Every structure is written in structure tokens, then in C-alpha cells.
């Protein structure tokens, strides 16, 4: 449990950074798809 408490915040921080980076890159190449959904 101690190992989980130390790895969970690190993993979530990396995950949110990757997700934000993907969203920013997707928004840069396809700006209309993100704000005007089907």
C-alpha cells in the first residue's frame, strides 16, 4: 500500500500531462472538431 501511495500521484501527473499534450496537439491540427462536435 505504501508503494501505491508513492506511485499513484506520479502516474496520475504523467497521465494528465500526456492527455493535456494530446488534446493541445489535436486542437492545433484539428481546431474545429474539438469545439464543434457532431
UniProtKB/Swiss-Prot annotation:
Subcellular location: Plastid, Organellar chromatophore thylakoid membrane
Transit peptide recorded as keyword: no
CC terms in the record's Gene Ontology section: organellar chromatophore thylakoid membrane; photosystem I; plastid
The UniProt record lists the keyword Plastid: yes
GO annotation, biological process: photosynthesis
Transmembrane stretches, start-end: 4-24
Membrane topology field: Single-pass membrane protein
Matching SUPFAM superfamilies: Subunit IX of photosystem I reaction centre, PsaJ
One matching Pfam family: PSI_PsaJ
HAMAP family: PSI_PsaJ
Role played: May help in the organization of the PsaE and PsaF subunits.
Family: Belongs to the PsaJ family.
Name of the protein in question: Photosystem I reaction center subunit IX
Species assigned in the record: Paulinella chromatophora
Gene: psaJ
Amino acid at each position: 500500500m505504501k508503494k501505491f501511495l508513492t506511485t499513484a500521484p506520479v502516474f496520475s501527473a504523467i497521465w494528465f500531462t500526456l492527455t493535456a499534450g494530446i488534446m493541445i496537439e489535436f486542437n492545433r491540427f484539428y481546431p474545429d472538431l474539438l469545439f464543434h462536435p457532431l
